[in-house]
Amino acid sequence: MQLIDGKAISAKVKEEVKNEAAQLTEKGVVPCLAVILVGDDKASQTYVNSKEKACKACGIRSLKYTLEANTSESALIDLIQSLNENDEVDGILVQLPLPKHIDENKILEKISCEKDVDGFHAVNVGRLVSGLDGFVPCTPCGIMRLFKEYDIEISGKNAVVIGRSNIVGKPMANLLLNANATVTVTHSKTQNLAKITKDADIIVVAIGKPNFLKADMVKNGAVVIDVGINRLENNKLVGDADFENVANKCSFITPVPGGVGPMTIAMLLKNTIKSAKNRLKRLK
């Protein structure tokens, strides 16, 4: 069993980003990410701060907009429109979840698809499904990078994605499909889940249920990618896989913490650089 070290790979990606940011800056394009936070959700604040810190460390300019929880939908849309029109901004990210009175989908559609570094805009989703180049959601994109770094073969393999969220499950399934895996997507209505997962060469579990994937659901030699981050009552962080028991059967597994998590912000930076490169092309 080999542990997939997301911290090490994310450090490698950040180093690439740092070099690319320096090259772009020399050419007069300073990569810039705008992050919008609505309300005072503690977890969201933590995420936004870590994104800001990562940008700074890699030479990406970051703009942070903190809005009151009672901000109107139209005021948020106005801010997004002004950032869409600002040529110096490469990426726009609205930290989710949003307060109840704001329609999340409507907001995500207002972000210019050329600045949608989270990859949530319908145009980018469509590009991913069609196998065209666009922005891909950061977590699945990071997982694909982990496969690449560890020379994990995807083509021709049976892959099972547990969870069908727009942020992880669906884009993950599309990326695996584009890489020629045979993909099954399972979810809360799936029957006989263990029967399906036992045939899988690759399992990506992303449902937010602690220790959900048990050893008897996994075949020997499988690759398990655990996207879950769950805090137990004793404050311990665990994933969606029962790590202690599942790990013994795997050829590769991501730990929690230190597996998939660090890759998410690294790929957000990578997407911001990609957008800045597109801006440079437009300027030429």
Curated annotation (Swiss-Prot):
SS bond list: none
GO biological process per UniProt: L-histidine biosynthetic process; methionine biosynthetic process; purine nucleotide biosynthetic process; tetrahydrofolate interconversion
Pathway per the UniProt entry: One-carbon metabolism; tetrahydrofolate interconversion
Gene Ontology molecular function: methenyltetrahydrofolate cyclohydrolase activity; methylenetetrahydrofolate dehydrogenase (NADP+) activity
Coiled coil start-end: none
Amino acids binding NADP(+): G163, R164, S165, S188, I229
E.C. number: 1.5.1.5, 3.5.4.9
Catalytic activity: (6R)-5,10-methylene-5,6,7,8-tetrahydrofolate + NADP(+) = (6R)-5,10-methenyltetrahydrofolate + NADPH; (6R)-5,10-methenyltetrahydrofolate + H2O = (6R)-10-formyltetrahydrofolate + H(+)
Alphabetized UniProt keyword annotations: Amino-acid biosynthesis, Histidine biosynthesis, Hydrolase, Methionine biosynthesis, Multifunctional enzyme, NADP, One-carbon metabolism, Oxidoreductase, Purine biosynthesis
GO cellular component labels: cytosol
Function: Catalyzes the oxidation of 5,10-methylenetetrahydrofolate to 5,10-methenyltetrahydrofolate and then the hydrolysis of 5,10-methenyltetrahydrofolate to 10-formyltetrahydrofolate.
Family: Belongs to the tetrahydrofolate dehydrogenase/cyclohydrolase family.
SUBUNIT field: Homodimer.
PANTHER family assigned: C-1-TETRAHYDROFOLATE SYNTHASE, CYTOPLASMIC (PTHR48099:SF5), C-1-TETRAHYDROFOLATE SYNTHASE, CYTOPLASMIC-RELATED (PTHR48099)
Protein's recorded name: Bifunctional protein FolD
